[in-house]
């Protein structure tokens, strides 16, 4: 495994509050790293599958830091120190800030959050059977400040606390006395 998504278990829990697809390994970061390095020592090429969980992208899932998480960056640095070729297979639902990775990792394959056939497609690319010639639908920024601000107003109260959901919703037609409505010009709709 190499590492957990994040070193802080509580933050990891909040980051994946809309789905619990992550299964945290309770071993220490050092134990996980040592295991990954032992496997890497027996390998000719290292394929590091890193990035975000799918729950970290989408509504109410904003991050102030769009770099790789601390545990993943440490794992990647240690894998590169082995001197073996490293391919970063990046799973993400949004552009990340990858300045360090771009400068240090020989090959980065961005696979987004692919579907059930992703393993076959990624394998075809890694083994050279298919050229990864797709065009990116977005630009990966050099810093968070380069990303346009689309949500520039106060938080609406989400995410809700564990177990708290909207309890009631009501929708009604409103009866209005039409004699009170005055239209100055004809309207079209």
Where is each model-derived feature located?
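An anion/phosphate-binding loop that grips the pyrophosphate of nucleotide cofactors and donors
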Residues: 43
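Short, flexible loop segments at the rims of nucleotide/cofactor-binding pockets, characterized by
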Residues: 22-27, 64-67
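Glycine/threonine-rich flexible loop motifs
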Residues: 52-69
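Catalytic alpha/large subunits of respiratory electron-transfer oxidoreductases
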Residues: 1-5
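Extracytoplasmic/secreted proteins, especially bacterial periplasmic and envelope-associated proteins
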Residues: 31, 35-38, 70-74, 78, ...
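A short helix->loop->beta-strand "cap" motif at the edges of active sites that frequently abuts
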Residues: 82-86, 105
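Secreted, periplasmic, or luminal enzymes acting at the cell surface/secretory milieu
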Residues: 6-24, 91-184, 188
